[in-house]
């Protein structure tokens, strides 16, 4: 690892693009090398930080600020961090980058049509029924990264995408 500081990988993409599957494979790849990481999964943290989420812009601003701060605290302790979170605004991810010097942004490129077909949590179906009104990539804006360190295709296997990310982490000498 690069000095005492940990590093962070923020895996972003619209809902159902495969972020969590890629995260699981990246953790497994790191574990295979004797490395561990703290995974900050937005779905899990949201149940703690916003138990009754509205997904409003104001709530998202606050939530992603907290998430970035948690990640920075861990990274300062030398703990690698993997963010598994849509973070629909660039500003959320850019803020984390300012807090964590060793930072890798990963964009999971995926069309809304593919995500709508996958829809494991039913959020696109809920949006179609009018029951969800803030789905990133549909009613809410999703701002893809301008210059991510890694871009992966959601149609590729999560294992292949995780290997691309791991290779970039190694190339940057974060591990």
What are these regions (language model features)?
Residues 19:
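Conserved lysine of the Walker
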């Amino acid at each position: 690892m690069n000095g005492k500081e940990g590093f962070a990988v923020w895996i972003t993409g619209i809902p159902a693009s495969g972020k969590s599957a890629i995260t699981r494979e990246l953790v497994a790849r790191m574990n295979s090398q004797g490395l561990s990481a703290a995974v900050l999964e937005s779905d899990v943290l949201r149940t703690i930080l916003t138990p009754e989420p509205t997904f409003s812009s104001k709530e998202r601003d606050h939530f992603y600020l907290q998430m970035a701060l948690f990640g920075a605290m861990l990274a300062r302790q030398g703990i690698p961090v993997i963010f598994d979170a849509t973070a629909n605004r660039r500003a959320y991810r850019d803020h984390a980058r300012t807090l964590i010097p060793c930072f890798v942004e990963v964009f999971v490129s995926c069309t809304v049509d593919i995500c709508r077909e996958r829809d494991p949590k039913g959020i696109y179906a809920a949006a179609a029924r009018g029951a969800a009104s803030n789905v990133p990539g549909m009613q809410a804006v999703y701002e893809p990264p301008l210059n991510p360190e890694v871009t992966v295709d959601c149609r590729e296997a999560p294992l292949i995408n995780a290997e691309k990310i791991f290779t970039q982490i190694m190339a940057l000498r974060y591990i």
